[in-house]
């Protein structure tokens, strides 16, 4: 190992700068802190296509949810929000999003966000130019473990078909001071540990 590589490793391990991570730093956290892993052996992490200069591309998995019409005709945040059963994209092998339709999809990537790190998710430009918006709540807190549920909305006048492994979003990472309360511990962490696409659990917030 080169001296420069040793210095870089020590810097990342003990003196990580509080800044937006670049490709080399993201790769370091993946390889040394298991910050990102794949939940599907058919789709291992692919640095060549996914690792960008300051971000990491996210691919849709095989788990999908569509909202179901509430019996009252109103979505009430005090009550569990009704969704259709989670279904797999493995059969027929794709998902078609109709114009004006909103769906939830999981990512193939599972995250283990260390304390002192946060992620920001946003859509890819190539996807947005088709009229498909990624409406995800973009902050991924320190301590979060699990896949990300992406919220996709088709604003185009045409149906859009996606396949497992399609890169639809990207995540940026920035380092911060360590938190006293991380996601998953000592707080209402409703989505920690999620692997499949997960609907809203906002009713847990209402006391």
Show which residues each predicted segment covers.
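Non-catalytic terminal segments and appended small domains
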Residues: 1-207
């Amino acid at each position: 190992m080169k001296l420069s590589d040793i210095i870089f490793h020590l810097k990342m391990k003990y003196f990580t700068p509080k800044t937006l991570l670049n490709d080399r730093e993201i790769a370091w956290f993946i390889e040394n802190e298991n910050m990102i892993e794949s939940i599907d052996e058919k789709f291992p992490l692919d640095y060549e296509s996914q690792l960008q200069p300051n971000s990491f591309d996210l691919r849709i998995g095989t788990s999908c949810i569509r909202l179901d019409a509430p019996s009252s005709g109103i979505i009430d945040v005090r009550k569990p929000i009704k969704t259709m059963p989670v279904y797999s994209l493995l059969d027929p092998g794709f998902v078609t999003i109709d114009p004006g339709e909103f769906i939830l999809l999981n990512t193939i990537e599972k995250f283990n966000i260390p304390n002192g790190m946060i992620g920001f998710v946003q859509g890819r430009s190539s996807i947005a130019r088709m009229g498909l918006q990624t409406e995800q709540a973009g902050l991924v807190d320190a301590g979060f473990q699990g896949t990300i549920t992406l919220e996709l909305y088709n604003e185009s006048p045409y149906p859009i078909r996606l396949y497992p492994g399609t890169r639809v979003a990207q995540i940026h990472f920035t380092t911060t001071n360590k938190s006293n309360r991380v996601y998953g511990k000592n707080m209402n962490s409703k989505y920690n540990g999620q692997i499949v696409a997960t609907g809203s659990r906002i009713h847990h917030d209402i006391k």
